Amino acid sequence: MSIRGARSVTRSLSCGVPQGSVLGPILYLLYTSPLGDIVRQYNMGYHFYADDTQLYLSFNSLSGDDQAYSVSQVESCVRDIDRWMSCNKLKLNRDKTELLVISSKYRPRPSLDSILVGDHRVERSDKARNIGVVFDETLSLDKHVSSVCKSALFHLRNIAKIRMYLTSESTKTLVHAYVTCRLDNCNSLLLGSPEYIIQKLQRVQNCAARLVAGQPRAAHIRPVLKELHWLPVEQRITFKVLLLTFKALNNLAPPYLSQLIVPYNPTRNLRSASKHLLEVPNVRLKSYGDRAFSVAAPKHWNDIPLDIKLSGSVDVFKSRLKTYLFRLAFS
C-alpha cells in the first residue's frame, strides 16, 4: 500500500487478497468467467460486477407462450449456474436473489409473479437495487430518487446540528462528502426524467446550498447557488452525460459506451463536417428512446461549442463545460 509516497511493508499472498482491494473483484470475475458461457447457451444477456450477477431476458408480455418459455429459460439457466457454483466451492445466495419484470407503464402489467431458483421460489419485486441504483418496474427511477433524497436529507440534518461550530469551508466539505456525492451518483440515468423527479433532487441541493452559505430557508436560491458556483441538478446531469461522451470519443470509456455513439460523416462536403457532430438515431418512443445514451449523448454533444469538444484533456473539458453550463443556468 502506498499513501503520499509512504509504502507499507511488502507481504506475500499465497492465496486470496485483502477484502475491499481493487484486485479482489477482478480475480473473482476471472474465477467465475465460465458462468458467461452458461448464460450465453440460453441466449440471455448478463452483467457481472464482482459477486453481483444479473441476468436479462426480453419477452412479449402479451404472449402467454413466450412468457412461459422465458420463465423456463431463466429457471434452467439459474439451475445450471447453481450446479456450476456448487462444483466450484461457491454458493448461490437464494435469499438475495430478486426478480424484477420491467415493462412500459402504458401497457398491461405482465402476469409473471415468480420463478423457481432450485427449491426456492423467488417472488416478483417492485424494485431492485442495481449497484447502488434502485430500479423499478417502469424504469422511472422515482423510487431511486426518493431513496437518494431521504439519505441526503438525513445527513443534512446531522450537519445542520453542528453548523454553528463549523466554518463555511468545513461545512462545504461535509456537504460534498455526504450529500453532493449522493446527488451525483449515477445521475446520468436521470437525463430526460420528468420535471417533478428533478425537482426532488433540486430541493435537496437548495437546502444544502443554504446550509453552506448560512442563509435562511426563505432566501432566494439562485444567488446562493451562483455565489457557491454550483451547477443546478439539471445541468449536473447534462455535465455527466457530456463527460461520458467525451471519454467515449477519446477511448477513455468502456467499449460498451463507445459503441453507442457514431461520428457524423456527411456524404457531401458540408460545413457541418468540421463541427465534430455525432449522428442522432431516430427513435419511436420519446419517453424511453430519447433518454437512451445513444440518443441523448449526440443531441447534447451537438449543442455545445466547438472549443469545448476540442479540449485536449479531461480536466480542460470539464473546466470549459462547467463554465458553459454555468452561464446557461444563470444567464
Segment roles from a protein language model:
Residues 1-331:
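Hydrophobic/basic alpha-helical segments
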